[in-house]
């Protein structure tokens, strides 16, 4: 009985701490936060093995599939993962028009403003400090994009959104326009439920992808994706040069056409946009 009562008390304390973490997260500019276990991502492991076998990988992500799918290889004491999302703007006020004689380039919206790794890192550091104040002996490891875990798989399991046919996590509040990050923690929080939603019969993103890079079930052939092609240093095949058009970095087509993104344009004070820089004149 004493063990049972101890577990009940511990659960109540962790639920109280969870609510405090959520409230604090919102106060520092984190738009969405969710909790999941530190269990392996077995379904993702199978998908990644198929992905690599088909030659779809970009080469930018961690190549060790075990590291990508087994959180405790990164932090052995991990009991939970806290996933966060920060929305970014997708509309540019006062943007110069691209017209004949004054052609303008385009950057993917995720690259607008300050480097998003810095934006996310500051928030994760503040959140980690807050948790350490409450639980001094907690062990934490934070990750943003360049970490070994799949940000999208963590976010989906933590209930931040569902994976759309364009491969992005689609949130009811943020659409696909969000930066994702996570932290492994040695505290056993109650996990949140994944979001039960889907794209239904909609295939607009698949149909409108300029290079046919979306291959179904949320999978992407990175070798054909313009976002990857504008970042690779390898030889660019002629068939893709025309399709890239005036894109200088990245591609947002599969997000721009997504019906789930209608009416969404999240703003934050530390994401400052400069139209002349974001739509530069092409020589």
Where are these regions (language model features)?
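Auxiliary alpha/beta "docking" domains used to position bulky ligands
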Residues: 13-198, 237
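Iron-sulfur cluster-binding cysteine motifs and their immediate structural context
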Residues: 30, 204-227, 233-234, 244-274
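A short, flexible beta-alpha/helix-coil linker loop
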Residues: 190, 231-232
